Each structure stands twice: as C-alpha cells, then as structure tokens.
Amino acid sequence: MACILHIETSTSLCSVAVSDDSHVIYHDEERTSEKGSAAERLGTMVDEAMSFTDSHAIPFDAVAVSCGPGSYTGLRIGVSMAKGLCYGRDLKLIAVPTLELLCVPVLLSEKLSISTLTSHLSPLASHLPDDALLCPMLDARRMEVYAGVYDRALKTVRPVQADVDDADTYREWLDQRPVFFFGPGAQKCMEAIGHPNARYIEGMEPLARWMQPLAERRLLSGQTEDVAYFEPFYLKDYVAKLPKKLL
C-alpha cells in the first residue's frame, strides 16, 4: 500500500501526518496565530515528518492536502507546500475536500458527545441513525459558515456553499430527519438553527491524521491532481483588509 504525507492548514490548527499501509504512523498538530508563523511552522512540521520516514526507510508515494474551503492564507500555504514537495520529489498530489475530512472522525468514532439546545451532553450512540445527515461547518467570518450536507456514506446531499446561519437554511432536511452539525463553525449556528432534529457534536476540527481513508481512496482510484495547475477551493474571493496603522 502507499505511504502518504498529509497536510491540513484550512484553519489555525496546522497539522501533518504520515500514513503507511492504511495506518497513521506519525502525526503532529499545532495552533498558529499569525500568517507568517503558520508558514514557518508548517515547514518545520513537514521536515520532522520526513525525518521520521527517512529514519524508518519509508519512501513517500504521494502528498495529500486539505483543499478547502477554509482560511485563504492557510489553504494557499498548505497547497503551495504540497505542490512543491510533489514537484521536487516526483510524487502524486491528492486533494481532500476539507468538509469531507471533517466527517471522518464522526463516522469512525463511538466516543463523541452530542448536544441539543434542550439537553446536556450525552454519549453518541455506537453508530449514527440510518437516516442521519452530516453537516460539517467551517467559520467563514461574519455571520456565514462554509457548510455541506452529506449522508453516512459521504454522498453529497447538498454541495458546499457559504451559508448564513439562520433557522431556514437547513429546514428542508431537519423537518425529515436528524442532522448532525459539527466543526469550527457549528458553535455560532446552534441558537440560530434551533430545531428539535438538530444535533451538535463538539470538539471536531479538521486534522491531517483523519485524511488517510479519503486520500488513499482517491489515490487508488486515480483521482490525483495536476501539480502545475492545481488551486485550492477557496469558494469565496479573497478580501484584503486595510492595515490597522496607516503610514
């Protein structure tokens, strides 16, 4: 099986991982606060991951990168790093959609916690209801979130888009079945959605160590990217901010 380096930089939690023979054998995560520090730390983290594989004489076959949506700067840094590694080492490039990545720990774990607006935290059942839908969310600033809707097989029910967090956005699904909301953007939507079929899973963030099943599936099916022309899925155009201090 393949050895894959995984890179995730869509949020302020920068992470890398290495999988070999369908098992994660190395992972590292670090919260960053400044744009410059994110680029610097990612380079160091990748170097450390490669030192680990070199010490075990494990050659890489591919690099997988979380491709968005998410932080414009973070995605640009992560994708640039992945493309550089693939070009320099003649590796295959795999793009993993960030919101699908967020679903992986929810589908695999039996020890999550869920909440509603009317109950305290309680253990998640050993598996999700058969008709459950998953709605991973990333903060898109202001009153918006990046969100998609998926079934338990990760089939897209509604494509990714930037949503305004109001009560009507997900009503067509909530009126019919339970919908599980999670990810860094879910917290600010809890009160706005306010539906009895809404379930909230806390503590979910996109991490490189969860990329393995999605990346490996894409690699085995030949879903790799053109290293020269691949770009992140930003979804929204970048908006430059004015500096706080004017010269």
Predicted region positions:
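Surface "functional belts" at beta-alpha junctions
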Residues: H23, E30-S37, K92-P206, Y234, ...
